[in-house]
Amino acid sequence: MARLNELYNKELVPQLMKDFNYRNIMQVPKLEKIVINMGLGEAIQNVKILDSAVSEMALIAGQKPVITKAKKSIAGFKLRQGMPIGCAVTLRREKMYEFLDRLINVSLPRVRDFKGISGKGFDGKGNYSLGVKEQLIFPEIDYDKIDKIKGLNITIVTSAKNDEEGKALLKLMGMPFRN
């Protein structure tokens, strides 16, 4: 069992039940999934960029990403419907907890001038999104094998009903929010 999952079951559930006066254990918010997305507009001109992005994403997430395609054509961007423009991974269960643990304890502290993550990334329903400017913060990525610095979006989907519950859950898991 992943370390964060154990922490959640043993310590966080009773703590959240006390803090929010839940009567039933099923009311306690929990992590549902983590979606990692890398959008690559440059893939329109050079499809080879997508291959390196897919391999890097597989190293970061620990599972093979799916290639995302354009939903509609946009002439201004020279984009046609169905063209590959990025990749995404959805993590659930053990891999989700292991990724979040690595993100909180290893990757985020490696960000330059890191003072904590913004508390404004919540969507109103308890889900949190954050952007990472470069994939080099992940220890799985070898600096010498990088051809281009790419950013990625990480969305943490919780079963929380509002932002307050979602933030409390993530804060107790160790997410370093800015005050």
Curated annotation (Swiss-Prot):
UniProt cross-references to Gene3D superfamilies, sorted A to Z: 3.30.1440.10
PROSITE patterns linked: RIBOSOMAL_L5 (PS00358)
Keyword entries, A-Z: Ribonucleoprotein, Ribosomal protein, RNA-binding, rRNA-binding, tRNA-binding
Keyword Cell cycle set for record: no
InterPro entries per the UniProt record, alphabetical: Ribosomal_uL5, Ribosomal_uL5_bac-type, Ribosomal_uL5_C, Ribosomal_uL5_CS, Ribosomal_uL5_dom_sf, Ribosomal_uL5_N
Keyword Nucleotide-binding: no
UniProt GO MF annotations: rRNA binding; structural constituent of ribosome; tRNA binding
Biological process annotations from GO: translation
Gene Ontology CC annotation, any one: ribonucleoprotein complex
One Pfam family named in its UniProt record: Ribosomal_L5_C
Function: This is one of the proteins that bind and probably mediate the attachment of the 5S RNA into the large ribosomal subunit, where it forms part of the central protuberance. In the 70S ribosome it contacts protein S13 of the 30S subunit (bridge B1b), connecting the 2 subunits; this bridge is implicated in subunit movement. Contacts the P site tRNA; the 5S rRNA and some of its associated proteins might help stabilize positioning of ribosome-bound tRNAs.
Complex and partners: Part of the 50S ribosomal subunit; part of the 5S rRNA/L5/L18/L25 subcomplex. Contacts the 5S rRNA and the P site tRNA. Forms a bridge to the 30S subunit in the 70S ribosome.
Family to which this protein belongs: Belongs to the universal ribosomal protein uL5 family.
HAMAP family given in the database record: Ribosomal_uL5_B (MF_01333_B)
NCBIfam families (alphabetical): PRK00010.1
The name this protein goes by in its record: Large ribosomal subunit protein uL5
